[in-house]
Amino acid sequence: MSVHKSIKRITASEIQAKKKQEPIVSLTAYQAYSARIADPHCDFLLVGDSVGMIVHGFDTTLPVDVDMMILHGKAVMRGSQRALVVVDMPFGSYEKSPEQAFSNASRILADTGCGAVKLEGGIHMAKTIDFLCKRGIPVMSHIGLTPQAVNHFGGFKTQGRDKSDWEKIEADAAAIEDAGAFAVVVEAVVEPLAVKLTEKLSIPTIGIGASNQCDGQILVMEDMLGYGAWAPKFVRRYGTLEQAMDTAIRNYAEDVKSRAFPSDSEIYKLK
């Protein structure tokens, strides 16, 4: 008689405990199949609002709503067993008030079964982070370049280059730490600042275009796999997904047109 051994899923507190330990590995995931493949290798999977751009073809993340995040969050939960699943709170779902944030965050956790939510912002979101954490919702924060504020930044620009910007990001990091966030994504900031934040904060820093000295790293899975003609400077291509897909589909199309597919071994015949 075989005994099924369930796999224990990583928790937010376990991610927090990895501060200054072995680097934390994370990727975005939007579908069950990609979550299944990434799950054995990642400490957490982020169901990012970047799903709007990668999967749904939007120009920015701004059109993404809570229903879309829940749909993809459910898929990633079904596809994964081990990694903590963190779901982004989309633009407009948490900024109005802590109560609004709690209503949407609690719905995301209840409907998807995920282990945490992520929201963008520093000092101005500290009250909301505190409100959520005190009510049992684990929160990952996101500072530096925050894609939901892309219009405010005037595009996707490196952060922390001047003194005032540097000091603001430092203040943001301190505020979200004090508010109870269990980790913080640090995106597209100058490397010395990322190193300083990692040294000063008691919670893990998850770098994306920051520094290899951060407590962990995250990339958009499709960028890392080589999907798309362009990727940000901070992306290392570990595969050639788009090229492989193009080759496979082209070969399929040629076989269909030449009637080479399906072959006798791929069809059903009367015995």
From Swiss-Prot:
InterPro entries: Pantoate_hydroxy_MeTrfase, Pyrv/PenolPyrv_kinase-like_dom, Pyrv_kinase-like_dom_sf
Keyword Disulfide bond: no
Transmembrane residue ranges: none
Reaction(s) the record says it catalyses: 3-methyl-2-oxobutanoate + (6R)-5,10-methylene-5,6,7,8-tetrahydrofolate + H2O = 2-dehydropantoate + (6S)-5,6,7,8-tetrahydrofolate
Subcellular location(s) of the protein: Cytoplasm
Source species, domain of life: Bacteria
Residues binding 3-methyl-2-oxobutanoate: D49, S50, D88, K118
UniProt key word Methyltransferase: no
Co-factor requirement: Mg(2+)
Functional pathway: Cofactor biosynthesis; (R)-pantothenate biosynthesis; (R)-pantoate from 3-methyl-2-oxobutanoate: step 1/2
A UniProt-annotated Pfam family: Pantoate_transf
Gene Ontology biological-process annotations: pantothenate biosynthetic process
UniProt remark on cofactor binding: Binds 1 Mg(2+) ion per subunit.
NCBIfam families per the UniProt record, alphabetical: panB, PRK00311.1
Family classification: Belongs to the PanB family.
HAMAP family xrefs: PanB
Quaternary structure (record): Homodecamer; pentamer of dimers.
Protein name, as recorded: 3-methyl-2-oxobutanoate hydroxymethyltransferase
Gene: panB
